[in-house]
Amino acid sequence: MFNSPVPKPVIIPAVLMAALLLWAGCCHSQTPAPDSKEGKQYPFIRYEANQLHYDSTSASMQLFLRKWHRVTTTGQGTVNIIHMGGSHVQAGVFPNQVRTNLLSSHPSLIGGRGMIFPYSAAAKCNNPDDYKVHCAEKVTLTRNVYASPEYPLGLCGIAVTARDVPTRIQILNTEKGFDYRTTHIVILGQSNQGIVPAISYEGRDVPPSYIDTATHRFVFNLRQPVDSFDIVLPCQKGQTFTLTGVCLGNRSPGISYHSIGVNGAAVPDYLKCSLSDDLKLLRPDLVIFGIGINDAAGKDFDTVAFKNNYLAICDTIRSVNPLCAFIFVTNNDSYRKTGRRRYAVNNNGPLAREVCYRLADITGGAVWDQFEIMGGLKSMEKWQKEGLAQKDKVHFTRAGYRLIGNLLFEAMQKEFAKPLPAVMETPKAPAKKPARNQRGKDKRRVTIQSKPSSNSNPDSDRFPYIPD
């Protein structure tokens, strides 16, 4: 037996030590942090599946990725992303997490806040957290989930109507992380009595710079940037004005992430809306589709109608931008309420997932497989036990929505980080009308199929409270 010599202490220069610490910090920062609040890894989440699935020869995906690379490397141009869905999107936590991550990655490219809607101007209607809305006067709410909406609807799928009295809707920006001041406001809406809205800020009412009656746009070019303002609707007895959306822009290049969501909305509900004019205003480069949880809520889920209704929306978008890229988000795992405190797993989740892959194949889009990533069938119960999903086993908590937003962002970042080919591959252009043999035997039925009512989730149309 022998004694080991005592090693001499190694003295590391301070500069080298700092460099090593910096390197270690960089390596640590590249580790996925699914929940920005807790940084916790969950054993039931399939992190290895967190990616976008698409054909690398897709023209729309190639062009979007090239445009993203060009804008983010040169600082010139704009990228417009629309995120469409139901209550998962209206609540705002999920899309805002994706938006926050994208803009934080490119702080010099803060584009306009984009399309918003004053949801809480109406009673019992929830608003995203990054802006507050107040309206003292009573307004009538119209949503695309209604069987026959009384008032016209646009891309937002929701409207508020002022009637008989002057109405003031206050929009207060509460986002402190980004400069969302705007110099360009577009009020979307119409009045059969010729009511013209105004914008009020710093104690004065400003009329529109110009009015486009064909597209129902009232455009305001402001002399100074504002982050909060009032929408003034000067109605008198017997007069109405229906507000269908508000678009906030600026003159800076950058990224705009528009979230469009209506509680309880299914795919056919958006077919009740006039989409084209508002789409021409935004001209999206990418649309993230998160509609489907309400379509698949009932036992009699019609996958053919689900696919064809989705294709009808895709056709409308492609009529505005023929090479708009699509990401189809598969439904989250969910349960169906069967009685008091009793739930049964919703087996339609895998069926909706298959349709999303079919849609991506037809349109040249991508799939973000939320269903697979979160753990597959019956995984929602595990999310609930961890405080990530609500008791209804359909909606997430705030922590859950933030986690989902982080995961989607990370999947997108993986694509952004890939080197672009020196020469663009021969693209597979998305066909405006897929061949008959691609559609199976459905013969492209685009009749609007309402979501099931008798067997649907009773909570799907309710205002989803999202606890911390």
Segments from the language model and where they lie:
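Catalytic His-Asp segment of secreted/periplasmic serine-dependent ester chemistry enzymes
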Residues: 263, 272, 333-449, 461-467
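Conserved SGNH/GDSL esterase-like catalytic core that processes O-acyl groups on lipids
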Residues: 90-200, 205, 209-308, 395, ...
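Conserved, compact domain cores that house catalytic/ligand-binding motifs in diverse enzymes
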Residues: 58, 77-83, 90, 94, ...
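Active-site neighborhood of phospho(di)ester-bond hydrolases with catalytic His/Asp-centered motifs
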Residues: 83-85, 110, 117, 329
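Membrane/wall-proximal cationic-aromatic binding patches
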Residues: 38-83
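Bacterial Sec-dependent N-terminal signal peptides
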Residues: 1-39, 456-468
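A generic secondary-structure signal
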Residues: 67-70, 101, 173-174, 277-278, ...
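Terminal targeting/pro-maturation regions of precursor/exported proteins
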Residues: 31, 75-77, 88
